[in-house]
């Protein structure tokens, strides 16, 4: 009894809130076998076909390329693109791409040579012997991005799930009307689907693997059951048809009963999901060494006489594919890329097929009905009942129209999956999804502007801090230079101090300054005063030398004779003074007598000078 209860719990499926049941419109393309689209005259490959920045070019105009040759470099979340066939690159220029804005993006234009020659391939039949990181790099370099519509880099998603993944879900629901690409892929390539699942199991090691498929695909269900025969590690879950059961959060709720929190991804609750088309691309990349250069595209609508699914090379113009399906242009022509609920009208039929192009819908005028004008919201609440994400579409609409960005963000605008269920049930014909997309774009633009402003402010503050540091360092260097002597200046100061010391006390002692000690201004002043003293000494020596030279010049004879006469007179007066002094002493006078010795000395000096003068006159 317990085992039966466990089995029923194991096979149980849940339901999600909201959702709608629009006409399916799948039979016109799902009952026809897939066809291979011939090569067009020119392929246009946009450099950015995934969620992330475009890669760096590896080729140039005029270069010959081979099928599968990478055209850009893949690093990080940048997924490379490859040449869909062999041929010549005729141009690398902007071209209109599959985007609602109709803006041109950089594209590589290739003219096929008709040979369809592959680059060298290295198949990995023994992928289980390969390292996990090698497998991830193989998937990344093959340029694989999510083929379900989001275009998230597959290798990055798998790398983030290497640890902590409990459940691996293969999304085969394909819930949007008209689209049958995955349906036909499972019918005709079920074995490749299962092989791709085994590769993912080897990488992620999940506890369980679930395939979720809607019950409106009986042929695909039968094909998968045949491919799974004898394998009990992969479980096929058939779920009721309801739009949008193919949404990641909605299918997670259906198969596991777990709800992904607001603002989170399914990996936060241990679930990782891959689209069935992505699984086939992984198998071909790992085992066959085939990069993502083609995909299945549904061509449908009443404007086509031969709708169906085509294997189309990436870069094939939309108009070329439409002609293969018997396109009958309407007046005015209307072509939608994607489904009727989540797709968008193409700005031009010259745009190329990209990796996320799963459907081209060419409806007739009667099929789409008349376009009714938008009216005011009547607050009926039908959009709230239909929303599968549990949001308040009416409030988000008012916030978007009023440009109340923070309120829209706080009401979880970015959890909107843009499924179009709210617009489908709106009686006022309000294109709610368009408002939400525009509001998201505006918020992202504001966030980018704020980020750029914050970066600019950080750069400015860093610059100001750097300038302040440089100013302080410069002032410190100037202060140090004012007191710090060079080696030559230090030697000069030491020499001056030594000379002053020797002059003052005659010693030979040297004043030593300890190593590393910063001299003060007194040393500089002492050196300056020493230099001044030296200059004064040299000046005095020069003056003394000049005086000596003047003294040693030729003596005037007349001056010598006069000097001799004066000397004799002084000597005579000295003798007379001696006699006068004697008389005065005898008379009892108190006057002081002159010292006879001084007089004798003076007389002797006078005689010597007279003799020298006579010799100067008569040297012989």
UniProtKB/Swiss-Prot annotation:
Topology in membrane: Peripheral membrane protein
Top-level taxon: Bacteria
Membership in a protein family: Belongs to the 4Fe4S bacterial-type ferredoxin family. RnfC subfamily.
Protein name: Ion-translocating oxidoreductase complex subunit C
InterPro entries for this protein: 4Fe4S_Fe-S-bd (IPR017896), 4Fe4S_Fe_S_CS (IPR017900), Ion_transpt_RnfC/RsxC (IPR010208), Nuo51_FMN-bd (IPR011538), Nuo51_FMN-bd_sf (IPR037225), RnfC_N (IPR026902), Soluble_ligand-bd (IPR019554)
HAMAP family (UniProt xref): RsxC_RnfC
Subcellular location: Cell inner membrane
GO BP, one annotated term: electron transport chain
Organism: Yersinia pestis bv. Antiqua (strain Antiqua)
Class of enzymatic activity (EC top level): translocase
GO CC annotations, alphabetized: plasma membrane
Entry's EC annotation: 7.-.-.-
Function: Part of a membrane-bound complex that couples electron transfer with translocation of ions across the membrane.
Required cofactor(s): [4Fe-4S] cluster
């Amino acid at each position: 009894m317990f085992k039966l209860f466990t089995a029923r719990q194991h096979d149980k499926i849940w339901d999600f809130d909201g959702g709608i049941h629009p006409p399916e419109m799948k039979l016109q393309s799902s009952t026809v076998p897939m066809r291979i689209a011939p090569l067009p005259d020119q392929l246009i490959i946009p450099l950015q076909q995934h969620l992330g920045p475009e890669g760096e070019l590896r080729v140039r105009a005029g270069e010959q390329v081979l099928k599968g040759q990478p055209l850009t470099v893949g690093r990080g979340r940048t997924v490379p693109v490859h040449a869909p066939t062999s041929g010549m690159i005729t141009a690398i220029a902007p071209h209109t791409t599959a985007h609602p804005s109709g803006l041109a993006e950089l594209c590589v234009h290739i003219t096929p040579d008709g040979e369809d020659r592959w680059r060298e391939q290295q198949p990995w039949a023994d992928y289980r012997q390969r390292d996990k990181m090698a497998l991830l790099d193989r998937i990344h370099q093959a340029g694989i991005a999510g083929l379900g519509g989001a275009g998230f880099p597959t290798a990055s998603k798998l790398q983030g799930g290497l640890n902590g993944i409990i459940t691996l879900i293969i999304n085969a629901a394909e819930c949007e009307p008209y689209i049958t690409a995955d349906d036909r892929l499972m019918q005709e390539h079920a074995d490749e689907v299962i092989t791709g699942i085994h590769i993912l199991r080897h990488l992620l090691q999940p506890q369980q693997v679930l395939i979720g498929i809607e019950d409106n695909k009986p042929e695909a269900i039968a094909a998968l059951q045949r491919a799974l025969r004898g394998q009990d590690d992969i479980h096929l879950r058939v779920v009721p048809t309801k739009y949008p059961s193919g949404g990641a959060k909605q299918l997670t709720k259906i198969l596991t009963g777990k709800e992904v929190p607001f603002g989170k991804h399914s990996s936060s609750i241990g679930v990782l999901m891959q689209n069935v088309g992505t699984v086939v691309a992984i198998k071909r990349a790992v085992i066959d060494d085939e990069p993502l250069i083609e995909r299945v595209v549904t061509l449908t609508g009443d404007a086509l006489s031969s709708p169906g699914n085509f294997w189309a090379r990436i870069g094939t113009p939309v108009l070329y594919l439409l002609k293969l399906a018997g396109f009958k242009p309407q007046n005015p022509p209307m072509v939608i890329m994607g489904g009727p609920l989540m797709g968008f009208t193409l700005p031009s039929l010259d745009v190329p097929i990209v990796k996320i192009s799963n459907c081209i819908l060419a409806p007739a005028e009667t099929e789409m009905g008349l376009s009714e004008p938008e009216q005011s919201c009547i607050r009926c609440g039908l959009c709230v009942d239909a929303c599968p994400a549990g949001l308040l579409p009416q409030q988000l609409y008012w916030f978007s129209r009023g440009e109340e960005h923070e309120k829209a963000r706080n009401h979880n605008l970015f959890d909107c999956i843009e499924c179009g269920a709210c617009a489908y049930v709106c009686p006022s014909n309000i294109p709610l999804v368009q408002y939400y997309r525009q509001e998201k774009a505006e918020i992202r633009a504001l966030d980018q502007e704020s980020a750029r402003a914050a970066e600019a402010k950080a750069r400015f503050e860093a610059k100001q801090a750097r300038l302040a540091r440089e100013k302080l360092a410069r002032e410190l260097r100037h202060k140090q230079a004012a007191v710090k002597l060079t080696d030559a200046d230090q030697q000069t100061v030491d020499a001056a101090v030594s000379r002053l010391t020797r002059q003052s006390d005659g010693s030979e002692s040297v004043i030593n300054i300890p190593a590393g000690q910063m001299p003060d201004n007194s040393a500089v002043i002492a050196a300056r005063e020493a230099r001044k003293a030296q200059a004064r000494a040299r000046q005095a020596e020069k003056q003394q030398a000049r005086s000596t030279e003047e003294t040693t010049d030729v003596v005037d004879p007349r001056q010598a004779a006069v000097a001799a006469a004066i000397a004799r007179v002084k000597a005579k007066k000295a003798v007379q003074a001696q006699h006068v002094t004697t008389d005065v002493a005898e008379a009892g006078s108190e006057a002081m007598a002159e010292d006879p010795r001084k007089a004798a000395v003076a007389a002797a000096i006078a005689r010597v000078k007279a003799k020298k003068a006579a010799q100067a006159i008569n040297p012989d």
